[in-house]
Structure formats: structure tokens, C-alpha cells
Amino acid sequence: MAKQSLDVSSDRRKARKAYFTAPSSQRRVLLSAPLSKELRAQYGIKALPIRRDDEVLVVRGSKKGQEGKISSVYRLKFAVQVDKVTKEKVNGASVPINLHPSKLVITKLHLDKDRKALIQRKGGKLE
């Protein structure tokens, strides 16, 4: 396949370097998750950067099917933690599991004025 744009490199090494050395402001966008079909129909957009207090559904991996609220977003590790998705340690303690947002689907948005402005800026519709 021919290269789509001459302005963007298709070199794997450069793409990986850009991903792993991205500043926090770009990592926010890289940590985006798709919206559920209902939210996609309601707001008219496909994906949003994930944030604390969004409700999500795990759609890939061993924890597939579990739901919960985002308890923390760890930009440095490209990971989010969901409050009900945990594993049990040998001593009986429960610890949260790090998940990548691409393996999640947002089922309920935490809306505030900034999030509403973002949806409108992306060309979405608010009810």
C-alpha cells in the first residue's frame, strides 16, 4: 500500500518513540476510549479521552464483561483503574488492575462544563 501522507512518517521506530515519549497533554488524547452504541447515538461522536468517574465496560481480556467506575487514570503507564475490577493477592488483599482504555467501552459519561464544551467542539450534539 502506498503511503497516505508525505508529512507523516510511517516508520515503526519513530511511531513507537513518539508514543512512549509523548507529553502528558498528548497522553490524555492517547488514553481515549470508544463510546457505547447508545452514547454514540445520543452524542454523535465515536470516542472521548477517558477520565475519572466515567462508567465503563471491559470488552477484552480476562476481565471481559465486568463494569465499574474509573477510579484513577495513570497517564505515565497508559493505564486506568476501574473500581470493581480487581485481583486478589495471596495474603487476601484486593488490588486494582491496570487496563488500557482501548479495551474498555464508556457506558456513562461524567459530564461537566468542560466535557460538554469538548463534545460540542468535536461536532457532537448535547441533548
UniProtKB/Swiss-Prot annotation:
The keyword Nucleotide-binding does not apply. It is found in: Cytoplasm. It comes from the Eukaryota. Keywords: Cytoplasm, Ribonucleoprotein, Ribosomal protein. The keyword Ribonucleoprotein applies. GO terms for cellular component: cytosol; cytosolic large ribosomal subunit. GO terms for biological process: cytoplasmic translation; ribosomal large subunit biogenesis. SUPFAM superfamilies: Translation proteins SH3-like domain (SSF50104). GO terms for molecular function: RNA binding; structural constituent of ribosome. Pfam families: KOW (PF00467), Ribosomal_L26 (PF16906). Component of the large ribosomal subunit (LSU). Mature yeast ribosomes consist of a small (40S) and a large (60S) subunit. The 40S small subunit contains 1 molecule of ribosomal RNA (18S rRNA) and 33 different proteins (encoded by 57 genes). The large 60S subunit contains 3 rRNA molecules (25S, 5.8S and 5S rRNA) and 46 different proteins (encoded by 81 genes). PANTHER family: 60S RIBOSOMAL PROTEIN L26 FAMILY MEMBER (PTHR11143). Belongs to the universal ribosomal protein uL24 family. Component of the ribosome, a large ribonucleoprotein complex responsible for the synthesis of proteins in the cell. The small ribosomal subunit (SSU) binds messenger RNAs (mRNAs) and translates the encoded message by selecting cognate aminoacyl-transfer RNA (tRNA) molecules. The large subunit (LSU) contains the ribosomal catalytic site termed the peptidyl transferase center (PTC), which catalyzes the formation of peptide bonds, thereby polymerizing the amino acids delivered by tRNAs into a polypeptide chain. There are 2 genes for uL24 in yeast. NCBIfam families: rplX_A_E. This is Large ribosomal subunit protein uL24A. The gene is RPL26A.
